[in-house]
Amino acid sequence: MNRLSKRKKILNCIDKSVQYNIADGLRILQETARVKFVENVDVAVNLGINPRRSDQNVRNSVVMPHGLGKKIRIAVFTQGESNVVLARRAGADFAGLEDLCQLIKTKGCTGFDVFIASPDVMNIVSQLGPILGPKGLMPNPKMSTVTQNLTDTIRNFKLGQVRYKNDKNGIIHAVIGKINFNISCLQENLEALVFSIYQVKPTQFKGIYIKKIYISTTMGRSILIDKSSLNVLIH
């Protein structure tokens, strides 16, 4: 009862109009977590861009310095025995071409988190667009998932590389780790994400680029973060 009362008291003290120091905000998330599974820590970055303008849309990827706390399952589209062996040695859970395409056609995405492809097989992989596209899993050079460098790409995703792009409202949604992570690790993951977003600021954009940053758990309330509490220079 005391634990529930403490949690309720903390929740009641959250002011949606207040910008919280990042460490304080993360601490509140940890103290109010109540579900029986280990929740993700989610981030919503509100950008000042006009998402209807193609030259202002933002997409990129970043390797989280402390990972994401989950095993990433990777499938690689490539041909030739040497490339298949290379991909598997780098950590791919499945590597191939015709057999992988057939697997997806018959069973869907089959639990894979990331699909990577060699450039020379994209003419075949593109036929899977109706299956992979709606789930955001279609290999794309802009997201570093169509590449000649299979080894480094696979290893980066295994380490916790996050792909992101703004939605129709100009908001970027991403996961920065698990709620049971150390606060400093979550903060450094968030700072890596924000810095990456700032690096791909559209060249023609004028105004406030990163307007607001919210953090939340999978099932919890969102908390507005004070941007100046991050160890990243942003505007």
Swiss-Prot record:
PROSITE patterns the UniProt entry points to: RIBOSOMAL_L1 (PS01199)
GO BP term, example: regulation of translation
Matching InterPro entries: Ribosom_uL1_bac-type (IPR005878), Ribosomal_uL1 (IPR002143), Ribosomal_uL1-like (IPR023674), Ribosomal_uL1/biogenesis (IPR028364), Ribosomal_uL1_3-a/b-sand (IPR016095), Ribosomal_uL1_CS (IPR023673)
Entry keyword set: Repressor, Ribonucleoprotein, Ribosomal protein, RNA-binding, rRNA-binding, Translation regulation, tRNA-binding
Function in brief: Binds directly to 23S rRNA. The L1 stalk is quite mobile in the ribosome, and is involved in E site tRNA release.
Record carries keyword Membrane: no
Protein name from the UniProt record: Large ribosomal subunit protein uL1
Family affiliation: Belongs to the universal ribosomal protein uL1 family.
Binding partners and assembly: Part of the 50S ribosomal subunit.
HAMAP family, per database record: Ribosomal_uL1_B
MF-aspect GO terms: rRNA binding; structural constituent of ribosome; tRNA binding
Keyword Calcium: no
Entry-linked SUPFAM superfamilies: Ribosomal protein L1
Gene Ontology cellular-component terms listed: cytosolic large ribosomal subunit
The encoding gene: rplA
Record-linked Pfam families: Ribosomal_L1
